[in-house]
């Protein structure tokens, strides 16, 4: 959530920065007017309270004065009406504020969509095959790794059921990701069901209510990302400065409606309603956030280096970043069978945007004041997508898939062949 006071005192600056994030001028103006209306009512309440205090003193001096008693009664009724109006105005103002995204860091390029993203680096060589490589969904069918039909029977479209070696490979991928960061990040195992407050804290609600699965007749939701659980572990808490920075990680399942994915590639294991990933979350002082983002992104990249899969790093433009992000790097792997790059990680600094919503603070030793922390989150990595990338990158002319060296210690096989 943006700082109300900074917004009020820098309207032109915030209008420019928010328009760069895709906010319409009318949406911004609606918030400004709602905030003004709320403050006007608050001022009227303050004046009425002052008048009520004076009236009380006068009534005490002139006991039983009918005129003063009537005036006091009318003022009391007016105050009640003003307080009701203020609560309504405050609710509207808060709702509109919660729907405004974070503003971009000055280092972020301005742009509408992914075409304005900047490619910063490439690692690894794209494989050269002496045959036509297959996309992962065809390999899944030929090697009987994913029972797409059974998953559809169990649930519906865009769910998958991994079989035997595929299930073991998925578990191995998750283990490698956790193990590579276990000395730096504290591991958690958290619920997959979260409440409205947690989703509001990290920014999924209220704006993206159509993208999350809500449990019927409850205020609970299936979590769309482990960022929600890990970031909200310290909601309404105050760190000592010495406790920062804190690094957390978790692996688990996530659920998304993917309401805006019409027309996008939905074959295979890339874009699912239920998916698995390893998440990294950091809490630090705001002045250290950008440095911590660089470190987090390198932590995610290290996994790809271990797996020896070619990838690139992108700096996302203002219009392509997530709602809560201040600055974001995406990591995309080369999908040899699809002949394209696909995202497997998104690492973001959110500044104090989420901390302000979730009330996560630290005691600043210099000022003695409670100050909002900065939060960061990153996928390290998307497990189903890495599974797909391994199939495409390590496929052979014989129709087999070799297991990357980094995963062999977790498995009792070194290649996947078609079952007899």
Curated annotation (Swiss-Prot):
GO process terms (BP): selenocysteine biosynthetic process; seryl-tRNA aminoacylation
Binding sites annotated in the UniProt record for ATP: 256-258, 343-346
Location(s) in or outside the cell: Cytoplasm
Keywords: Aminoacyl-tRNA synthetase, ATP-binding, Cytoplasm, Ligase, Nucleotide-binding, Protein biosynthesis
Subunit relationships: Homodimer. The tRNA molecule binds across the dimer.
Family from the record: Belongs to the class-II aminoacyl-tRNA synthetase family. Type-1 seryl-tRNA synthetase subfamily.
Function summary: Catalyzes the attachment of serine to tRNA(Ser). Is also able to aminoacylate tRNA(Sec) with serine, to form the misacylated tRNA L-seryl-tRNA(Sec), which will be further converted into selenocysteinyl-tRNA(Sec).
Protein name per its UniProtKB record: Serine--tRNA ligase
């Amino acid at each position: 959530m943006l700082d109300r006071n900074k917004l009020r005192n820098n309207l032109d600056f915030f209008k420019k920065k928010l328009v760069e994030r895709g906010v319409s001028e009318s949406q911004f103006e609606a918030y400004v007017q709602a905030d003004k209306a709320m403050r006007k009512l608050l001022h009227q309440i303050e004046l009425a309270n002052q008048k009520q205090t004076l009236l009380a003193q006068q009534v005490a001096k002139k006991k039983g004065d009918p005129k003063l008693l009537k005036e006091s009664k009318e003022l009391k009724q007016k105050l009640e009406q003003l307080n009701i109006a203020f609560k309504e105005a405050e609710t509207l103002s808060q709702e509109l504020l919660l729907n405004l995204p974070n503003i971009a860091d000055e280092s972020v390029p301005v742009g509408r969509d992914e075409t304005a993203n900047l490619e910063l680096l490439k690692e690894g060589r794209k494989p050269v095959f002496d045959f036509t490589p297959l996309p992962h969904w065809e390999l899944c069918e030929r090697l009987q790794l994913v029972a797409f039909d059974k998953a559809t029977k169990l649930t519906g479209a865009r769910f998958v059921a991994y079989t035997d070696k595929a299930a073991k490979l998925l578990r191995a991928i998750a283990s490698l990701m956790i193990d590579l960061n276990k000395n730096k990040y504290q591991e958690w195992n958290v619920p997959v069901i979260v409440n409205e407050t947690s989703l509001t804290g990290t920014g999924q609600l209220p704006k993206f209510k159509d993208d999350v699965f809500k449990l019927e007749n409850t205020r609970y939701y299936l979590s769309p990302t482990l960022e929600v659980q890990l970031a909200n572990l310290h909601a309404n808490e105050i760190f000592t400065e010495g406790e920062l920075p804190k690094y957390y990680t978790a692996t688990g399942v996530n659920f998304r409606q993917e309401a805006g994915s019409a027309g996008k590639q939905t074959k295979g294991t890339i874009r699912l309603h239920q998916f698995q990933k390893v998440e990294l979350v950091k809490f630090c002082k705001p002045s250290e956030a950008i440095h911590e983002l660089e470190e987090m992104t390198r932590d995610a990249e290290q996994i790809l280096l271990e797996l020896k899969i070619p990838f690139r790093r992108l700096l996302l433009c203002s219009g392509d970043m997530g709602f809560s992000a201040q600055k974001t790097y995406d990591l995309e792997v080369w999908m040899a069978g699809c002949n394209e790059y696909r995202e497997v990680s998104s690492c973001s600094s959110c500044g104090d945007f989420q901390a302000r919503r979730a009330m996560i603070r630290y005691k600043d030793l210099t000022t003695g004041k409670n100050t909002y922390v900065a939060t960061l989150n990153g996928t390290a990595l998307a497990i189903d997508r890495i599974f797909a990338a391994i199939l495409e990158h390590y496929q052979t002319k014989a129709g087999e898939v070799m297991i990357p060296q980094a995963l062999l210690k977790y498995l009792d096989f070194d290649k996947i062949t078609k079952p007899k």
